[in-house]
């Protein structure tokens, strides 16, 4: 068994959609990034790539490549899954946390789990997502951005 750790952060800005776990969340701001800036999926992808010693999302989907401009991170997650399978790994589990002062994310977590389960073609009980705040501290607490952390375990076939 191997484990991987992922982390991502993006700045909150006006005139962008807020996408987390492939779910569009109603909010006055969204995350700034080259793709859809889905911090949850970016952290998950980095944890999976790390567990398989396949680098990180910047290596596979560079922000200097216009073909990834505005792309759905669900599509990128599907590509990461193909790489994992090609290299002989099976996902054992994923545990993630989203750190955001606002908006409240609990109502959207199950839909995020469904999206991730579908993109990775794994059972939903292998995916856990939590949401928390930093009690008004730091850049997430002052609502300047949202971050996410993810850990996963994979098994070599």
Swiss-Prot record:
Cofactor: binding details: Binds 1 divalent metal cation per subunit.
Tree of life domain: Bacteria
MF GO annotations: 2-C-methyl-D-erythritol 2,4-cyclodiphosphate synthase activity; metal ion binding
GO terms under biological process: isopentenyl diphosphate biosynthetic process, methylerythritol 4-phosphate pathway; terpenoid biosynthetic process
Cofactor(s) required for function per UniProt: a divalent metal cation
The reaction(s) this protein catalyses: 4-CDP-2-C-methyl-D-erythritol 2-phosphate = 2-C-methyl-D-erythritol 2,4-cyclic diphosphate + CMP
EC number: 4.6.1.12
Pathway entry: Isoprenoid biosynthesis; isopentenyl diphosphate biosynthesis via DXP pathway; isopentenyl diphosphate from 1-deoxy-D-xylulose 5-phosphate: step 4/6
Record flagged with keyword Magnesium: no
Swiss-Prot/TrEMBL site (Transition state stabilizer) positions: 34, 133
Enzyme class: lyase
Binding site for a divalent metal cation: 8, 10, 42
Residues that hold 4-CDP-2-C-methyl-D-erythritol 2-phosphate according to the record: 8-10, 34-35, 56-58, 61-65, 132-135, 139
Matches recorded under InterPro entries: MECDP_synthase (IPR003526), MECDP_synthase_CS (IPR020555), MECDP_synthase_sf (IPR036571)
SUPFAM superfamilies: IpsF-like
Keywords: Isoprene biosynthesis, Lyase, Metal-binding
Pfam families, alphabetized: YgbB
Binding partners and assembly: Homotrimer.
Family recorded in the similarity comment: Belongs to the IspF family.
Function, in words: Involved in the biosynthesis of isopentenyl diphosphate (IPP) and dimethylallyl diphosphate (DMAPP), two major building blocks of isoprenoid compounds. Catalyzes the conversion of 4-diphosphocytidyl-2-C-methyl-D-erythritol 2-phosphate (CDP-ME2P) to 2-C-methyl-D-erythritol 2,4-cyclodiphosphate (ME-CPP) with a corresponding release of cytidine 5-monophosphate (CMP).
Protein name (Swiss-Prot/TrEMBL): 2-C-methyl-D-erythritol 2,4-cyclodiphosphate synthase
Species of origin: Clostridium botulinum (strain Alaska E43 / Type E3)
Lineage: Bacteria, Bacillati, Bacillota, Clostridia, Eubacteriales
Gene name as annotated: ispF
